[in-house]
Every structure is written in C-alpha cells, then in structure tokens.
C-alpha cells in the first residue's frame, strides 16, 4: 500500500482542539516535524481536518509507515 509523508508547517497556536488532537493522532509534535503514514481513509480524514497546517507528499524510496518518533 502507498505511504504519505506528512509535515507540519504551521503552528497550533490558536487552532481548535479537534485540529490539535488530529495532529497528535498523526504523530506530529512541532513545526517541520515529518511522519510517514499509510495512505488509507483514516489518515486522509485526519489530514482533511488539518490540511491548512500540514504539507502532504507521497513517500518515496523504501520508507515504511512509522508511528511517531524522530525522523
């Protein structure tokens, strides 16, 4: 299955609670932090909630979906 690289590009200051929790669920903690997630409906739904705070691109290479952690 395809993977997505999700990078937080804007701050969570002043955003709604649901958006902040969606970022945490994706595993994003700070600006310029990236995670690789499996491309599925759940992930797409979380991205839709915070689309103005993140950048999404297809993951390239031998990347595998990872749970939080530092990249």
UniProtKB/Swiss-Prot annotation:
Transmembrane segments: none annotated. Keywords: Ribonucleoprotein, Ribosomal protein. Signal peptide: none annotated. GO terms for cellular component: cytosolic large ribosomal subunit. One of its GO terms (biological process) is translation. It comes from the Bacteria. One of its GO terms (molecular function) is structural constituent of ribosome. HAMAP family: Ribosomal_uL30_B. Belongs to the universal ribosomal protein uL30 family. Part of the 50S ribosomal subunit. This is Large ribosomal subunit protein uL30.
């Amino acid at each position: 299955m395809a993977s997505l690289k999700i990078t937080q590009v804007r701050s969570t200051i002043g955003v709604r609670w649901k958006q902040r929790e969606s970022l945490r669920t994706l595993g994003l903690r700070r600006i310029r932090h990236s995670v690789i997630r499996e491309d599925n409906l759940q992930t797409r739904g979380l991205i839709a909630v915070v689309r103005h705070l993140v950048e999404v691109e297809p993951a390239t290479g031998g990347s595998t979906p990872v749970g939080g952690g530092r990249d």
